[in-house]
Amino acid sequence: MTGIQKLVFQVRRDIVRMVHANNSGHPGGSLGCTEFFVVLFFDIMKRKKKFNMNGYDEDLFFLSNGHISPVFYSVLARAGYFPVEELSTFRKINSRLQGHPTTHEGLPGVRIASGSLGQGLSVAIGAALSKNCLLYTSPSPRDSGK
């Protein structure tokens, strides 16, 4: 098993643990895009170890469909942006790891609040006017009028 395959396995384990511990969340979408997120964050994206909201000299990532936050949080933790142990606080009161990522929580790696499907597309297009950026979204934005 390669390092990437081991990481995919661990991220999937994190997702199941987070969702099961709270009896709440969207495991299907998160589990379905785990390989994409792991390869993107650990093999493709140009990113720095320490998160910088401005994203100078690195690729930008925006998550539009925030309901897949378990995979996003797990990958951010595994990338070293915050302690892996914090994953156990997913969807708990006063946790930075809510059902949809938000910027006011100050969580490293989160550039935009997500929730309204398609919102990330507009943000990513705006950022792309000045630099290279990456966006992952569900097919739903086409149906949301964005």
Language-model regions: role of each:
Residues 136-143:
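Conserved small/polar residues in nucleotide/adenosyl-binding loops
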Residues 15-18, 30-135:
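Cofactor-binding active-site loop characterized by glycine-rich and histidine/acidic residues
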Residues 1-4:
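Non-catalytic, mobile gating and regulatory segments of ester bond hydrolases
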Residues 8-24:
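N-terminal capping segment at the start of a domain
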